[in-house]
């Protein structure tokens, strides 16, 4: 049975186009995989703290030396990693904020990027350990940035996801949403056309 993990990273609880389009993409994937299980990780509702002394200390303390507080921190990270490992397909709703990802998504990445857990260093260089999965990124943007220097989001996501082993990544863009009603309509139509082709 296929498991789909949808990660919503918008800072808006309602009406975020990245979330709405990610919902549509997940529904499309379900059509092609009857009986698929869907797990939704809402990074706004279940906010993760930014890295600090406590989190870093927990990650780098040997398991047999951790305090109860550190064990709780690592358990939360393990929960997130287990979701990734259990998923066959990953859908990330990733709005562009100030040319990059939301702080919610960056915090999520910081909580799952753990040496020896989601990646490891070898004599041949780093190796991602979350392998054999298909990932989709749905990026909603107010302006038009694909292929331009202002798009620092796409290369960052490709680099990070590839670093942990997710190398099969398809991007769906809704660009120009803030450029007027006609541009927004065109952007959403283009994104939905890409979703329909999945």
From Swiss-Prot:
It comes from the Bacteria. One of its GO terms (molecular function) is oxidoreductase activity, acting on NAD(P)H as acceptor. Its EC number is 1.6.5.-, 1.7.1.17. Gene3D superfamilies: 3.40.50.360. Its cofactor is FMN. InterPro entries: Flavodoxin_fold, Flavoprotein-like_sf, FMN-dep_NADH:Q_OxRdtase_AzoR1, NADH:quinone_OxRdtase_FMN_depd. It catalyses: 2 a quinone + NADH + H(+) = 2 a 1,4-benzosemiquinone + NAD(+); N,N-dimethyl-1,4-phenylenediamine + anthranilate + 2 NAD(+) = 2-(4-dimethylaminophenyl)diazenylbenzoate + 2 NADH + 2 H(+). Keywords: Flavoprotein, FMN, NAD, Oxidoreductase. Binds 1 FMN per subunit. Homodimer. Quinone reductase that provides resistance to thiol-specific stress caused by electrophilic quinones. Also exhibits azoreductase activity. Catalyzes the reductive cleavage of the azo bond in aromatic azo compounds to the corresponding amines. Belongs to the azoreductase type 1 family. This is FMN-dependent NADH:quinone oxidoreductase. It comes from Burkholderia mallei (strain ATCC 23344). The lineage of its organism: Bacteria, Pseudomonadati, Pseudomonadota, Betaproteobacteria, Burkholderiales.
């Amino acid at each position: 049975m296929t498991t789909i993990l949808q990660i919503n990273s918008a800072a808006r609880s309602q009406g975020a186009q990245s979330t709405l389009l990610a919902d549509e993409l997940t529904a499309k994937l379900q059509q092609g995989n009857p009986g698929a299980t869907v797990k939704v990780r809402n990074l706004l509702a279940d906010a993760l703290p930014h890295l600090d002394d406590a989190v870093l200390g927990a990650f780098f303390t040997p398991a047999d030396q951790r305090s109860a507080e550190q064990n709780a921190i690592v358990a939360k990270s393990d929960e997130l990693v287990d979701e990734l490992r259990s998923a066959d397909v990953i859908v990330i709703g990733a709005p562009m904020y100030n040319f990059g990802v939301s702080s919610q998504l960056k915090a999520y990445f910081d909580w799952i990027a753990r040496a020896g857990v989601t990646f490891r260093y070898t004599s041949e260089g780093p190796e991602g350990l979350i392998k054999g999965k298909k990932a989709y990124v749905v990026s909603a943007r107010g302006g038009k940035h694909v292929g331009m220097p202002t798009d620092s989001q796409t290369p960052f996501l490709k680099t990070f996801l590839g670093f942990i082993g997710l190398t099969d990544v398809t991007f769906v863009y809704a660009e120009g949403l803030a450029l007027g009603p006609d541009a927004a309509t065109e952007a959403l139509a283009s994104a939905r056309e890409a979703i329909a082709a999945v």
